[in-house]
Every structure is written in structure tokens, then in C-alpha cells.
Amino acid sequence: MTPARDRVRRHRERLRRQGLRPVQIWVPDVNAPEFRREAHRQSELVAAGEHEAEDQAFVDAISVDWDDA
């Protein structure tokens, strides 16, 4: 095996000994044009909704200011 492959194998073995297991999931491609269009469409619906102020307050409350983190 190559040194990199050996390191990865040992790392995965350590994680398994700790009781962990690998999980693979498929997620939307946020760079895909269809994803961007749909995200924009949904954001416009939320912004135009009757609860826009409450929705924005919620987002603000759970958001992290990365400059302060």
C-alpha cells in the first residue's frame, strides 16, 4: 500500500475502535444552477410572506457572527 493509503486505513481503524462507523450521504449540489434557482425562489417566497419579520428574527437569533466567533 502507499503511505497515504496506510495512513487512511490506520485512521479509519482507530475511529472504528472508538465505536464509530463511516456514513455516506448524498446532498444537493449547491453549485448547480437548478439548486440556486430553487433557493432563490424559496427565499423570495419567505421574504414576501406575512411572517417575514418573525422569520428573519429567528434566522438572526440562530446565526453566528463569524468575526466575533
UniProtKB/Swiss-Prot annotation:
Disulfide feature: none
Among its keywords, does the record have Transcription?
yes
Establish whether keyword Repressor is in the entry: yes
Q: Which UniProt keywords apply?
A: Repressor, Toxin-antitoxin system, Transcription, Transcription regulation
What is the deletion mutant like?
A: The mazE-mazF operon is not essential. A triple TA mutant (missing vapB-vapC, mazE-mazF and phd-doc TA systems) survives antibiotic challenge, suggesting the TA systems are not required to generate drug-resistant cells. However the mutant is more sensitive to oxidative and heat stress, and does not survive long term starvation during aerobic growth on complex medium. There is a difference in the level of branched-chain amino acids, which may play a role in monitoring the nutritional supply and physiological state of the cell.
Stored InterPro entries: MazE-like
Give the function comment from the record: Antitoxin component of a type II toxin-antitoxin (TA) system. Neutralizes the effect of cognate toxin MazF. In M.smegmatis 3 TA systems (VapB-VapC, MazE-MazF and Phd-Doc) may be involved in monitoring the nutritional supply and physiological state of the cell, linking catabolic with anabolic reactions.
* SUBUNIT field: Forms a complex with cognate toxin MazF.
In Swiss-Prot or TrEMBL terms, this protein is called Antitoxin MazE
Q: Which gene is transcribed and translated to give this protein?
A: mazE
